[in-house]
Every structure is written in structure tokens, then in C-alpha cells.
Amino acid sequence: MMKFVVFLACLFVAAHSFAVEGEEEYFEAEVPELERAKALPPGSVCDGNESDCKCYGKWHKCRCPWKWHFTGEGPCTCEKGMKHTCITKLHCPNKAEWGLDWRSEESERSPC
């Protein structure tokens, strides 16, 4: 009986280790290539259909002219946003690229 319990425990550990290894590969593939690319500096042209993570820093987002949503005219640029921008960019995969200054002010209380 004891050998059977040990065998089941080993089988469970082996199955769990393969499942965890597969999840890591899944999470790496989940991040789109464009979000892993270098961040754009403030004022540069960006694509309004993509994530704001491509704009450098926690406060900058890709802002488009109001008529862009209807006609697609005019370039979108990386411009300073508001606190909501910072909150949504907390989970960006490329925030390590921004350096330590991405959390410089209010570092003891909140990252935003």
C-alpha cells in the first residue's frame, strides 16, 4: 500500500512539472513581438491600433487626432497622458526598458 502511495505521488509530481514547463512557454508566446520591441520616444509617430506600451515611460500613450478614429487621417504620436495611462501601463512587458525613472516620483506610496 505504501509503495502505491509513493508511486502516485511521484507520478503527480512528474505530471505537474511538465504542466508548469508548458505554461512558461505559453506566457512567453502570449506577449506580441511589437510590445517587446524598443519603446518610442515622446513625440514620435505611433500606430493607434496597437498598445500604449510601445510609447516610452509610464505617463506616455499613443494619442491620435479626434478624426483619426473615423477617417484614419493624421499621424498618431506618443504624448503625455493622465494617471489612467500610468495605471494601464503597469503591466507592460517592456517597462524594464524605461529604467528606474519610470517609478521615480511617489515611489514609496504608489508606482503612479
From Swiss-Prot:
The membrane spanning regions, by residue number, are none
GO CC field: extracellular region; host cell presynaptic membrane
Any one GO molecular-function label of the UniProt entry: calcium channel regulator activity
| Pfam families found in the cross-reference section | Toxin_34
Q: In which tissues is it expressed?
A: Expressed by the venom gland.
Positions of the propeptide removed during maturation = 20-36, 103-109
Where does the protein end up? Secreted
Instruction: State what this protein does.
Output: Omega-agatoxins are antagonists of voltage-gated calcium channels. They block insect neuromuscular transmission presynaptically. This toxin is a blocker of L-type calcium channels (Cav/CACNA1).
Self-association state and partner proteins as the record states = Heterodimer of two subunits, a major chain and a minor chain, linked by a disulfide bond.
Q: Which family does it belong to?
A: Belongs to the neurotoxin 04 (omega-agtx) family. 01 (type I omega-agtx) subfamily.
What is the protein's name according to its record?
A: Omega-agatoxin-1A
